[in-house]
C-alpha cells in the first residue's frame, strides 16, 4: 500500500468530520490550492481509502438504539460460519472479526421500544448456531464517535 503523507491524513480526518466542505474550504484549511485538493481526493478514492461520502445520523432522534453483540465461536475456525449466519440480517450494521475473549463483534440497530428490540435480539440469537458464548450489550448513550 502506498504511504500517505501528512496532508493526505489531515484531509481524510477533516472529511471524516465534515464531508460537505467544498474543495475551496478544504484548500483554505490545509493551506493549498483547490486543484491539489481535487487531485488528492481523486487519488484517495482510487486507492480505496475514501470509499464514500456520507452522513452520520443521530439514531436516538430517529427512534433507534445500538446493541453490541460479543460472540465467541465454538472454535476459531467457526467464526466465518457464524459471520455468514448473521451478515444478511437487515438490522446487523457491522460485523467485525477479531482476536481475544470474543472473536466476533456485531453492531445491531434496534428500535428504542424495548419489546420490539427484545424480539429482534431473540430472532438474532436463534440464527447463531456455531457459538460457544454470546453477550448482548444495549448502548444507552454514545459519548464519542470518531472514524479516525
Curated annotation (Swiss-Prot):
One of its GO terms (molecular function) is sequence-specific DNA binding. Disulfide bonds: none annotated. Pfam families: HTH_24. Keywords: DNA-binding, Transcription, Transcription regulation. The keyword Transcription regulation applies. It comes from the Archaea. Residues 23-42 bind DNA. Residues 4-65 form the HTH asnC-type domain. The keyword Transcription regulation applies. PANTHER family: HTH-TYPE TRANSCRIPTIONAL REGULATOR PTR2, TRANSCRIPTIONAL REGULATOR, ASNC FAMILY. This is Uncharacterized HTH-type transcriptional regulator PH0061. The lineage of its organism: Archaea, Methanobacteriati, Methanobacteriota, Thermococci, Thermococcales.
Amino acid at each position: 500500500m502506498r504511504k500517505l503523507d501528512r496532508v493526505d491524513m489531515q484531509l481524510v480526518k477533516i472529511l471524516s468530520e465534515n464531508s460537505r466542505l467544498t474543495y475551496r474550504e478544504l484548500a483554505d484549511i490545509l493551506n493549498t490550492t483547490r486543484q491539489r485538493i481535487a487531485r488528492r481526493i481523486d487519488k484517495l478514492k482510487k486507492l480505496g481509502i475514501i470509499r464514500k461520502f456520507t452522513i452520520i445520523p443521530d439514531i436516538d432522534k430517529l427512534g433507534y438504539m445500538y446493541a453490541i453483540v460479543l460472540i465467541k465461536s465454538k472454535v476459531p475456525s467457526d467464526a466465518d460460519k457464524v459471520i455468514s449466519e448473521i451478515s444478511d440480517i437487515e438490522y446487523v450494521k457491522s460485523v467485525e472479526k477479531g482476536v481475544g475473549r470474543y472473536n466476533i463483534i456485531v453492531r445491531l440497530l434496534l428500535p428504542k421500544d424495548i419489546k420490539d428490540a427484545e424480539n429482534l435480539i431473540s430472532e438474532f440469537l436463534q440464527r447463531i448456531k456455531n457459538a460457544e458464548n454470546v453477550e448482548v450489550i444495549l448502548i444507552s448513550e454514545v459519548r464519542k464517535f470518531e472514524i479516525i
